[in-house]
Amino acid sequence: MITLIICTYNREKYIGPLLDSIAKNDYPTTDYEIVLVDNNCTDNTRGICEMFATDHPEINLHYVVETEQGLSAARNKGIKEAKGDIIIYVDDDALVDSDYIRIYAEHFAAHPDTMAAGGPIEPLYETQEPAWMSPYTKALLTAWMNYGDTVREYPQGRYPGG
Protein backbone atom coordinates (compact mmCIF):
# COMPACT_ATOMS: atom_id res chain seq x y z
CA MET A 1 0.00 0.00 0.00
CA ILE A 2 1.18 3.49 -0.88
CA THR A 3 0.00 6.57 0.97
CA LEU A 4 -0.03 9.96 -0.72
CA ILE A 5 -0.01 12.69 1.92
CA ILE A 6 -1.24 16.10 0.84
CA CYS A 7 -1.00 18.87 3.44
CA THR A 8 -3.07 21.89 2.54
CA TYR A 9 -3.94 25.35 3.74
CA ASN A 10 -6.41 27.47 1.76
CA ARG A 11 -5.59 26.06 -1.68
CA GLU A 12 -9.08 25.74 -3.13
CA LYS A 13 -7.73 26.97 -6.47
CA TYR A 14 -5.22 24.12 -6.74
CA ILE A 15 -6.54 21.14 -4.75
CA GLY A 16 -9.16 20.08 -7.32
CA PRO A 17 -6.73 19.92 -10.25
CA LEU A 18 -4.22 18.03 -8.07
CA LEU A 19 -6.80 15.43 -7.03
CA ASP A 20 -7.98 15.10 -10.64
CA SER A 21 -4.39 14.44 -11.76
CA ILE A 22 -4.06 11.73 -9.10
CA ALA A 23 -7.34 10.17 -10.27
CA LYS A 24 -5.83 9.78 -13.76
CA ASN A 25 -2.99 7.60 -12.47
CA ASP A 26 -2.46 4.18 -14.02
CA TYR A 27 -1.81 2.59 -10.61
CA PRO A 28 -4.60 0.42 -9.13
CA THR A 29 -6.79 2.45 -6.78
CA THR A 30 -6.91 -0.54 -4.41
CA ASP A 31 -3.16 -0.18 -3.82
CA TYR A 32 -2.98 3.44 -2.69
CA GLU A 33 -4.72 5.89 -0.44
CA ILE A 34 -4.76 9.66 -0.18
CA VAL A 35 -4.47 11.26 3.24
CA LEU A 36 -5.42 14.90 2.84
CA VAL A 37 -4.48 16.97 5.88
CA ASP A 38 -6.45 20.20 6.26
CA ASN A 39 -4.26 22.59 8.25
CA ASN A 40 -7.10 24.92 9.34
CA CYS A 41 -8.41 25.91 5.92
CA THR A 42 -10.92 28.75 5.90
CA ASP A 43 -11.77 28.54 2.20
CA ASN A 44 -13.71 25.88 0.24
CA THR A 45 -10.90 23.29 0.23
CA ARG A 46 -13.02 20.85 2.25
CA GLY A 47 -16.02 21.18 -0.08
CA ILE A 48 -13.85 20.52 -3.14
CA CYS A 49 -12.36 17.43 -1.49
CA GLU A 50 -15.79 16.14 -0.48
CA MET A 51 -17.04 16.58 -4.06
CA PHE A 52 -13.97 14.71 -5.34
CA ALA A 53 -14.62 11.85 -2.89
CA THR A 54 -18.24 11.65 -4.08
CA ASP A 55 -17.19 11.67 -7.74
CA HIS A 56 -14.41 9.09 -7.17
CA PRO A 57 -15.66 6.49 -4.67
CA GLU A 58 -13.05 4.06 -6.02
CA ILE A 59 -10.27 6.21 -4.52
CA ASN A 60 -9.55 5.80 -0.83
CA LEU A 61 -9.46 9.43 0.40
CA HIS A 62 -9.10 10.25 4.10
CA TYR A 63 -9.75 13.90 4.94
CA VAL A 64 -8.32 14.83 8.33
CA VAL A 65 -7.81 18.12 10.15
CA GLU A 66 -4.63 19.18 11.96
CA THR A 67 -5.30 22.17 14.21
CA GLU A 68 -1.64 22.86 15.01
CA GLN A 69 -0.61 25.25 12.27
CA GLY A 70 2.42 24.43 10.14
CA LEU A 71 3.68 21.98 7.56
CA SER A 72 5.61 19.83 10.05
CA ALA A 73 2.54 19.31 12.24
CA ALA A 74 0.41 18.55 9.17
CA ARG A 75 2.94 16.04 7.81
CA ASN A 76 3.19 14.32 11.18
CA LYS A 77 -0.61 14.04 11.28
CA GLY A 78 -0.51 12.52 7.79
CA ILE A 79 2.05 9.94 8.90
CA LYS A 80 -0.11 8.99 11.90
CA GLU A 81 -3.11 8.46 9.60
CA ALA A 82 -1.19 6.62 6.86
CA LYS A 83 -1.71 2.91 6.27
CA GLY A 84 0.90 2.58 3.53
CA ASP A 85 4.37 1.10 3.72
CA ILE A 86 5.51 3.83 1.33
CA ILE A 87 4.69 7.48 1.98
CA ILE A 88 4.76 10.06 -0.79
CA TYR A 89 4.34 13.73 0.04
CA VAL A 90 2.60 15.71 -2.68
CA ASP A 91 2.45 19.50 -2.50
CA ASP A 92 -1.05 20.94 -2.61
CA ASP A 93 -0.27 23.11 -5.63
CA ALA A 94 1.30 20.33 -7.71
CA LEU A 95 0.07 18.19 -10.58
CA VAL A 96 1.26 14.61 -11.02
CA ASP A 97 1.78 12.60 -14.19
CA SER A 98 -0.37 9.54 -14.94
CA ASP A 99 2.51 7.17 -14.08
CA TYR A 100 3.52 8.99 -10.89
CA ILE A 101 2.44 6.41 -8.31
CA ARG A 102 3.50 3.43 -10.41
CA ILE A 103 7.02 4.82 -10.86
CA TYR A 104 7.43 5.18 -7.10
CA ALA A 105 6.06 1.67 -6.53
CA GLU A 106 8.42 0.19 -9.11
CA HIS A 107 11.38 2.09 -7.68
CA PHE A 108 10.82 0.88 -4.12
CA ALA A 109 10.22 -2.69 -5.33
CA ALA A 110 13.49 -2.66 -7.30
CA HIS A 111 15.45 -0.86 -4.55
CA PRO A 112 14.06 -2.09 -1.21
CA ASP A 113 16.87 -0.45 0.78
CA THR A 114 15.81 3.00 -0.41
CA MET A 115 14.71 5.22 2.45
CA ALA A 116 13.67 8.27 0.42
CA ALA A 117 13.17 9.10 -3.23
CA GLY A 118 12.19 12.01 -5.39
CA GLY A 119 11.91 12.97 -8.99
CA PRO A 120 12.08 16.00 -11.22
CA ILE A 121 10.23 19.11 -10.12
CA GLU A 122 9.14 21.30 -13.01
CA PRO A 123 7.38 24.63 -12.39
CA LEU A 124 4.06 25.20 -14.12
CA TYR A 125 3.56 28.88 -14.84
CA GLU A 126 0.12 30.47 -15.02
CA THR A 127 1.21 32.36 -18.13
CA GLN A 128 4.77 31.91 -19.37
CA GLU A 129 8.16 31.71 -17.71
CA PRO A 130 9.34 35.24 -16.89
CA ALA A 131 12.10 36.54 -19.16
CA TRP A 132 14.31 37.27 -16.15
CA MET A 133 14.21 33.65 -14.94
CA SER A 134 17.64 32.00 -15.11
CA PRO A 135 18.58 28.43 -14.15
CA TYR A 136 19.82 29.80 -10.81
CA THR A 137 16.71 31.80 -9.95
CA LYS A 138 14.49 29.00 -11.27
CA ALA A 139 16.01 26.54 -8.79
CA LEU A 140 15.89 29.07 -5.98
CA LEU A 141 12.36 30.39 -6.50
CA THR A 142 10.42 27.43 -7.90
CA ALA A 143 12.09 24.37 -6.31
CA TRP A 144 12.98 23.28 -9.86
CA MET A 145 15.39 20.39 -9.98
CA ASN A 146 16.12 17.51 -12.28
CA TYR A 147 19.04 15.17 -11.68
CA GLY A 148 18.15 12.93 -14.61
CA ASP A 149 16.72 9.43 -14.92
CA THR A 150 19.56 7.55 -13.23
CA VAL A 151 19.03 6.24 -9.70
CA ARG A 152 21.64 7.80 -7.43
CA GLU A 153 22.22 9.30 -4.02
CA TYR A 154 21.03 12.82 -3.49
CA PRO A 155 23.95 15.24 -3.83
CA GLN A 156 25.57 16.04 -0.50
CA GLY A 157 25.04 19.62 0.56
CA ARG A 158 21.87 19.99 -1.54
CA TYR A 159 18.35 20.02 -0.16
CA PRO A 160 15.08 19.00 -1.76
CA GLY A 161 12.77 21.87 -2.61
CA GLY A 162 9.11 22.20 -1.98
Task: Tell me what each language-model feature is.
Residues D99-M133:
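Conserved donor NDP-sugar-binding/catalytic core segment of glycosyltransferases
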Residues S21, T29, D38-G47, A94:
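A conserved acidic beta->alpha catalytic loop
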Residues M1-T3, E33:
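Cell-envelope/extracellular polymer assembly enzymes that use nucleotide-activated donors
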Residues T137-G161:
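Short, flexible, basic/aromatic active-site loop/helix in glycosyltransferases
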Residues I87:
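Short aromatic/hydrophobic "clamp" motif used to bind/position activated sugar donors
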Residues R11-N25:
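Short, well-formed alpha-helical segments that are part of the catalytic scaffolds
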Residues D31-N40, H62-E66:
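Short beta-strand/loop segment that forms part of the nucleotide-sugar
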Residues E66-A82:
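Glycine-rich, basic loop-to-helix element that forms the pyrophosphate-binding segment
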